[in-house]
Amino acid sequence: MITSLEGSVRPAVYLAEDLVARGCDISIISPVILPDAESKLCEMGIKPVNLGVRHFSSAFDSSLLWFEVWMYEALFNLNSKRARDESPATINFSHVVFVPSIFWYLQGPPSLALRDIISGLSFSFKMAYAFLKPMIEYLDGRVVKRGGKFSSIRIANSKFCASMYSKFGLKVHDIIYPPLDRRIFRPSTSRPSEDYVLTYFGKETKFSVIKKIADLGVKIKAFGSKTSFIDKGILKHPNIEYLGRISTSDLVDAYSNALFTLFPFTHEPFGYIPLESMSCGTPTLTYNMQGPGEYIIDGENGWLVGSDAHMVEKAVEIWREGYPARMRRCCVKESLAFDREIYVKKWLKMLGSFSVI
């Protein structure tokens, strides 16, 4: 499902773009592709194949739209039935449509994501989840097993992500971390203002932690477009400035000038926010778990904490005392390992071993 070319779509789009540059004919198949995204894919020389699955959720609420489209597949195999006339795929980056493929790139099962994030959602969401939880978990297990049968090699986007799929009995053969375009995400200034802390507002955000930090006098700027998940009360906080959805160039500036990036999450298989921040030279304060815990090095390119209370305490400490300038240099250095060129080379090696290219 492609509503934009950002986020979880990046691994597919970046690889497709590089393969097109090498003279390959590339198609991307999706149950839903919004017109703007479709136009951009065409401009890149990628053939978009929009299966045109009808949906009732708003295209502007990508999380609900994704869940609706996933339910169609989980219950009726609807999306895969529409894709039957298409050629077998080389790589399946999707969790909502399945055709025979060599590789399946895993980015996280929805049932485990819902289990983690539900505590921060509204009462109505919690009630609906309590009723639907057994069915969602059963369907998710069935989808994962079906996806495994359609693919020969399964590759996860992090060690934590691989561990989630192993709970369903799926064998994961390798790890390839998602790519970052360091031509875009790089420090935009050599003299950052460092007069605010940057954070992200989304369905995975622990708003209670952000509010406690703001209550203690820390100036916070927040970006994000998933407004239906945002605690409306927090938007009126005097120490919180909500930027909404911002352009990539503005986001790079926001990362580059922040004192640090605050990332209190409930569920994150990989975590683009800390990585983008690192690449812009700004360390991240987050939890020592899941995806971010695999690439944040405590005291080097960020800080890892074990609890909400420790995060609040550490955020205030950094706000008041700062940190060594070397941490910014370390952030940029550590982000090199995630450059899209390295990501593409790993895939080229994989594809070459199966004589695909």
Show which residues each predicted segment covers.
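Aromatic "clamp/platform" in nucleotide-sugar-dependent glycosyltransferases that forms part
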Residues: 266
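Short hydrophobic beta-strand element within catalytic cores of glycosyltransferases
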Residues: 283-286
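A charged, aromatic-enriched C-terminal amphipathic alpha-helix characteristic of glycosyltransferases
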Residues: 322-353
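Active-site donor-binding segments of glycosyltransferases and PAPS-dependent sulfotransferases
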Residues: 28-93
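Conserved acidic donor-binding segment of nucleotide-sugar-dependent glycosyltransferases
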Residues: 245, 298-299, 303-309, 317-323
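Membrane-proximal helix-turn-helix segments that form the acceptor-binding/catalytic region
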Residues: 121-154, 162
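Conserved catalytic-core segment of nucleotide-activated headgroup transferases in glycan assembly
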Residues: 167, 180-184, 190-233
